[in-house]
């Protein structure tokens, strides 16, 4: 009896989905890499092109704008064809976007890089819209949230690798001249340093493009499970009306927007936050940036460990209740980030990652409960909610560019936005818990 219970998470009707699960789970690590090699690039591009934090944050606008633009086209595509086809198209666009970094570097301008990011994340949108519900379908509905949490547990491993590569193969190898020094360069000196820095920046993207192509061909030639039902008829508007009438889905999309915004803000602007704190303690700017990225890696390790721990705890707790507890804890740590103007504020910012670990897949799993084959469109709505990562970081960057807010360092004050996000998440967790209690009683 116990053995059957252990096998059930990756089995359905006596069929094991272990190999497909492993292959699709590898994609979770791949988009984690893309996300977290990109977050530090806001600061890097700002320095390379001598721009403000707000202009640098356009990287996040392009990056998460691609998610938003392709979510429903991806859903229509996988409804017409299959999850596997969606995964393959996503990998193809991911690789193409990564390879576009080379012509962008040859142009030597900022905006071609934004186009490359946009195309890359159009691929990620296809990949996530396909992979998340694909994982949910590889077993029974009762174990779907646990299965997705397990798959999502490998996402931060890719994120850790992305952070490590960003720190050691991009940030540490950029020209060490600080922001003030770059501002005083002549035009010819600026161009020479910019060309060198861009050459450093593009190499990891070209390499990951080759890795993506390898995964593409492995999945292409592997037998994968088909969609639960073949339905080439697209009832787009009626399906959307149907799923958005469900409170748990409608509120889930709204909440996911704020969660992704909080995650990207915390992981992007830890560089600015840490740099300010460490320079205040006498560290040089380039050293402060690299050290801040080390704190970001610690945050991701904490995120990764917490994901596995919370996935286990989820076996014994109501998903909404655990989500609410983690959101309240995240809000408390964010309050510390705002109020503390020393290294303890940075410690609080690192601790926030432990609280965020379970949020994305838990919100995702709760929102898609009971949607059946409509989960293809439901997943698209949740992927569109990743737009929060495009909208909210530029707002935070604009606050940071103010330098001071009500006598407080603007970097600290800017974290009021993630705090608000955690309040929204806590409310969703609470309402989910109430709905679960209502079902038990009713």
Where are these regions (language model features)?
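Intracellular juxtamembrane helix-capping segments at the cytosolic ends
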Residues: 126-140, 357-372
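Central cavity-lining transmembrane alpha-helices of secondary-active solute carriers
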Residues: 58-78, 297-309, 388
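Helix-to-loop junctions at the C-terminal end of transmembrane segments
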Residues: 70-83, 170, 306-319, 400
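C-terminal ends and interior cores of transmembrane alpha-helices
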Residues: 92-107, 328-341
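Extracytoplasmic gate region of multi-pass secondary transporters
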Residues: 38-42, 162-173, 242-296
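Multi-pass alpha-helical transporter architecture, strongest
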Residues: 216-223, 419-442
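Hydrophobic core of transmembrane alpha-helices in multi-pass small-molecule transporters
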Residues: 110-130, 344-359
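Cytosolic juxtamembrane N-terminal segment immediately preceding the first transmembrane helix
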Residues: 1-27, 31, 47
């Amino acid at each position: 009896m116990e053995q059957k219970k252990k096998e059930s998470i990756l089995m359905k009707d006596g069929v094991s989905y272990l190999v497909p699960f492993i292959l699709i789970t590898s994609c979770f690590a791949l988009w984690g890499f893309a996300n977290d090699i990109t977050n530090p690039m806001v600061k890097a591009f700002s320095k390379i092109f001598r721009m403000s934090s707000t202009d640098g944050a356009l990287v996040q606008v392009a990056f998460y704008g691609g998610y938003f633009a392709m979510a429903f086209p991806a859903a229509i595509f996988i409804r017409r064809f299959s999850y596997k086809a969606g995964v393959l198209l996503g990998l193809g666009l991911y690789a193409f976007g990564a390879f576009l970094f080379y012509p962008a570097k040859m142009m030597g301008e900022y905006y071609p890089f934004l186009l490359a990011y946009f195309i890359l994340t159009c691929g990620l949108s296809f990949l996530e819209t396909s992979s998340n519900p694909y994982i949910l379908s590889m077993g029974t509905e009762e174990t779907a949230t646990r299965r997705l949490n397990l798959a999502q547990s490998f996402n931060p491993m890719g994120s850790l690798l992305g952070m490590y590569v960003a720190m050691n193969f991009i940030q540490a190898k950029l020209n060490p001249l600080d922001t003030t020094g770059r501002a005083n360069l002549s035009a010819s000196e600026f161009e020479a340093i910019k060309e060198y820095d861009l050459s450093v920046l593009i190499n990891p993207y070209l390499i990951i493009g080759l890795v993506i192509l390898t995964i593409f061909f492995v999945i292409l030639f592997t037998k994968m499970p088909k969609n639960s039902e073949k339905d080439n008829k697209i009832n787009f508007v009626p399906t959307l009306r149907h799923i958005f009438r469900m409170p748990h889905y409608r509120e889930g999309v709204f909440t996911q927007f704020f969660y992704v915004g909080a995650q990207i803000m915390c992981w992007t602007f830890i560089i600015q936050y840490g740099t300010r704190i460490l320079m205040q303690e006498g560290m040089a700017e380039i050293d402060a940036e690299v050290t801040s990225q080390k704190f970001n890696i610690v945050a991701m390790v904490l995120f990764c460990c917490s994901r596995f721990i919370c996935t286990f705890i989820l076996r014994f707790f109501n998903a909404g209740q655990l989500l609410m507890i983690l959101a309240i804890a995240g809000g408390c740590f964010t309050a510390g980030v705002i109020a503390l103007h020393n290294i303890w504020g940075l410690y609080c910012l690192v601790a926030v990652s432990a609280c965020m670990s379970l949020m994305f897949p838990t919100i995702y799993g709760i929102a898609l409960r009971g949607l059946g084959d409509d989960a293809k469109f439901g997943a698209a709505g949740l992927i569109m909610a990743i737009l929060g990562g495009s909208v909210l970081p530029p707002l935070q960057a604009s606050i940071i560019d103010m330098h001071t807010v009500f006598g407080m360092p603007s970097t600290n004050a800017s974290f009021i936005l993630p705090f608000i996000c955690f309040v929204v998440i806590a409310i969703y967790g609470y309402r989910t818990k109430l709905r679960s209690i209502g079902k038990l009683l009713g």
